[in-house]
Amino acid sequence: MTDTTKIDYSKTLYLPQTEFPMRAGLPQREPLFVQRWEEMNLYKKLREQAKDRPLYVLHDGPPYANGNIHIGHALNKILKDVITRSFQMRGYNSNYVPGWDCHGLPIEWKIEEKYRAAGKNKDEVPINEFRKECREFASNWIKVQTEEFKRLAILGDFENPYTTMNFHAEARIAGELLKFAASGQLYRGSKPVMWSVVERTALAEAEVEYHDIESDMIWVKFPVAGEVATENDLSGSAVVIWTTTPWTIPGNRAVSYSSRIEYGLFEITEAENDFGPRPGERLVFADKLVEECCAKAKLQFKRLRSVSAEELGKIVLDHPLKGFGGGYEFVVPMLDGDHVTDDAGTGFVHTAPSHGREDFEAWMDNARQLEARGIDPNIPFPVGDDGFYTKDAPGFGPDREGGPARVIDDNGKKGDANKVVIEQLIAADKLFARGRLKHSYPHSWRSKKPVIFRNTPQWFVYMDKNLGDGTTLRSRALKAIDETRFVPAAGQTRLRSMIEGRPDWVLSRQRAWGVPICVFVDEEGNILQDDAVNKRIMDAFEKEGADAWFADGARERFLGARAGEGWTQVRDILDVWFDSGSTHTFTLEDRPDLKWPADVYLEGSDQHRGWFHSSLLESCGTRGRAPYNAVVTHGFTMDEHGKKMSKSLGNTVTPQDVIKESGADILRLWVMTTDYWEDQRLGKSIIQTNIDAYRKLRNTIRWMLGTLAHDEGENVAYADLPELERLMLHRLTELDELVRSGYDTFDFKRIARALVDFMNVELSAFYFDIRKDALYCDAPSSIRRKAALQTVREIFVRLTTWLAPMLPFTMEEAWLDRYPQSVSIHAEQFRPTPAEWRDDVLAEKWRKVRAVRRVVTGALELERADKRIGSSLEAAPVVYIADKSLSDSLEGLDFAEICITSGISVSDAAAPEGAFTLGDVKGVAVVPERAKGEKCARSWRYTTDVGADPEFPEVSARDAAALRELQALGKL
């Protein structure tokens, strides 16, 4: 080589080389992977690969087949996907069968909207034609949502999903109902249910949401019946109740009190209003509430005496509407009720068993005693399904001049019922006071209109009937809850409290699109128990679907020879929660690729009252235990300020928009870094935070790929590895334990945080930074370089597989860049970690080394900031260490290499005044000094041996030796 030959030293370095782009381009690149996975049928390949492994089953809670997916769907499906992928990569056959909930009111509502727009009347359309349109509507949205889920990288058996409208599913749902009928758990009763006048159907609690409304409130006088109270001064007095539903007064049958409350008899002394109580009237109130009530009515009063609970229990009252419309001539008993408080009102509760759950329960608890007292215990039906009063509300129903009054009209608007009832109470001199109140009130989640409680004939499942083995459905469900794992644990308490307090399960809906309550009954509501009839029903549903129940001639077809016996065919359909609660039967039990019970159910926290709840009841009622071993819940997604997302507020974030602008892996990273079991926040700034975190992660992966381009797969024996490499392998053992534990406990945030911190803090800012010199500049034969490549290789394989369930697109891209002949990273397993890699003693030593290093780097940062050095390689600091355990930790190490300086001196002398220190590292001080020698043109390190090799006068002896080796290999 001549003196005139100029070497381009950058071409002699092992610099990173990769086609893995720095800019991810996820919106454009991700669909290519979706297409690749589809073309290779990745899901099927994984099933074949894992066919001999133990099954792990997450049973998919079915989303509703109506509309595009929203951010809640994305959160839910991503969490499920991470679970199934992580178990697949840890040695399980982790199947995922997606499902859809297809029946129910929302779809009916959409078809009815279409009819209304076309001027068609739904009632004039044959029911099976209507059901056909509902089925087609659901099918279309299943196709749309399938593609949207695939775009999120959800991996599942989308070619063979389950749907609740599949003929086999409908047959199985019907079969589950017939099991309840056969065991005597199903009964026809009447009960106040939440009723949507607009939709003409009963609603489950899960279908109701609460909004503030302003209502009439009234205080009403119930006179003490004279013939009962002649022996004391309660004769001629009245008990006062308070209600925010004046329209329920015609349904009143009792007044409830509490034996825990102190009551008094009060006399009115002055009255300002022209209507209402007059001076001299005597009224009974709770002592705590009389002043507030009388102030509302502008009355002055005096207390006459106490009234005991025993006394209240003996009297009966006259109905305030007594005689109106020729009705209300019955007496109104006083009932002791646990639900009565003196927090508000009068201390007495107007009890209308037709219009309230607690009212109903209080009435039924006392039914036998009431009947013994000559009081009719039957519960009336004062309001019809159309919101009009019936004949059971004399004077307000069909007998009323001008027609019956109405509680709510077809548009969900308040009718005239409150007005006419209040007017009649005034006319009867039974109104104590009136006012307006803003309060929370139930509304249909679909129509957004108020609902009412009304007594209706419905089909129920008993919660407390003895099932023949000493258990009840409630006791079975509570036992199952205790045997189930909940994440978070608070979910167990929440579901338990709901089961403990819930009433009998209402199964019926008065709609068209659903699985029918396929039973026949006599006039008393007794169910026909006939195996041959049931078999004909099940066989027909299996072949034709539940439409068979509504076809012409269905009654005769199914009853066969018993058609002449007078059995009535029930036309109600099942609540959709019974549908979804039965999915475990036709998926987990019936599919050979699944198993019963499921390992886990995962849904939003609202499903404690929804799918978790109905699945638990259905399975406990028919199989005696829950259909799941674990229940995982997530919260709801709010905007970045913690407000509920709403189109009207313009603060919604759609998964489609995030994917289009940033990519699905960004959305998945957001899910993985949230406390998903709580309510999460999402908005532009939060998305940007995740984009920034993703870029750092991607650049770390990219650097490893570029570095590994020079990896020839050589391995250095563990015993020969430098300490720094052994430290990194030790960290992999710790992370391996954390990752596996995190996936087991569904603690994804812990995994994501740990891996991101490892990549940013321990790799990019520590290990990679230190080893760049060896990786780029060392000779091909260097053990140090080979050891570093081997370690980067081990880190890459583990990081990418650990992250693959979370970021499937990016990790697939990185894996195929490194291993282009591979099927997919998702066909890989988490690598086992050799036990010898664990070295806690070494880790403790390096904790001390890194503490000293932090003081050095802190001192050099100040030097850089003050422009005294440009690079740490220009420095050769002096480190003063007073703590012997810290100085001992540096023995045998090239501490200059670790600090990325060209030299370093360690002294046990006292540090000079002004030396740099860190408060949290005691006994260490640093005095920065410039490095001696010349700058190597190849490595940029300052050494005193630059030019030692005359053939390479610009470089250090180390670099000259590397160049000679490259030259010998023909690479220079």
Curated annotation (Swiss-Prot):
Predominant localisation class: cytoplasm
Positions bound to L-isoleucyl-5'-AMP: 603
Signal peptide: none
Catalysed reaction equations from the record: tRNA(Ile) + L-isoleucine + ATP = L-isoleucyl-tRNA(Ile) + AMP + diphosphate
Record's keyword terms, sorted: Aminoacyl-tRNA synthetase, ATP-binding, Cytoplasm, Ligase, Nucleotide-binding, Protein biosynthesis
Residue sites binding ATP per the record: 647
Top EC class for this record: ligase
EC number: 6.1.1.5
Subcellular location: Cytoplasm
Pfam families in the cross-refs: Anticodon_1, tRNA-synt_1
One GO term describing the cellular component: cytosol
Superkingdom of origin: Bacteria
Cross-referenced InterPro entries: aa-tRNA-synth_I_CS, aa-tRNA-synth_Ia, Anticodon_Ile_BEm, Ile-tRNA-ligase, Ile-tRNA-ligase_type1, Ile-tRNA_ligase, M/V/L/I-tRNA-synth_anticd-bd, Rossmann-like_a/b/a_fold
Positions occupied by motif 'KMSKS' region: 644-648
Motif ('HIGH' region): 63-73
Subunit-structure text: Monomer.
UniProt function note: Catalyzes the attachment of isoleucine to tRNA(Ile). As IleRS can inadvertently accommodate and process structurally similar amino acids such as valine, to avoid such errors it has two additional distinct tRNA(Ile)-dependent editing activities. One activity is designated as 'pretransfer' editing and involves the hydrolysis of activated Val-AMP. The other activity is designated 'posttransfer' editing and involves deacylation of mischarged Val-tRNA(Ile).
NCBIfam families: ileS (TIGR00392)
Domain notes: IleRS has two distinct active sites: one for aminoacylation and one for editing. The misactivated valine is translocated from the active site to the editing site, which sterically excludes the correctly activated isoleucine. The single editing site contains two valyl binding pockets, one specific for each substrate (Val-AMP or Val-tRNA(Ile)).
Entry's family note: Belongs to the class-I aminoacyl-tRNA synthetase family. IleS type 1 subfamily.
Annotated protein name in UniProt: Isoleucine--tRNA ligase
Native organism: Brucella abortus (strain 2308)
Taxon lineage: Bacteria, Pseudomonadati, Pseudomonadota, Alphaproteobacteria, Hyphomicrobiales
Gene name linked to the record: ileS
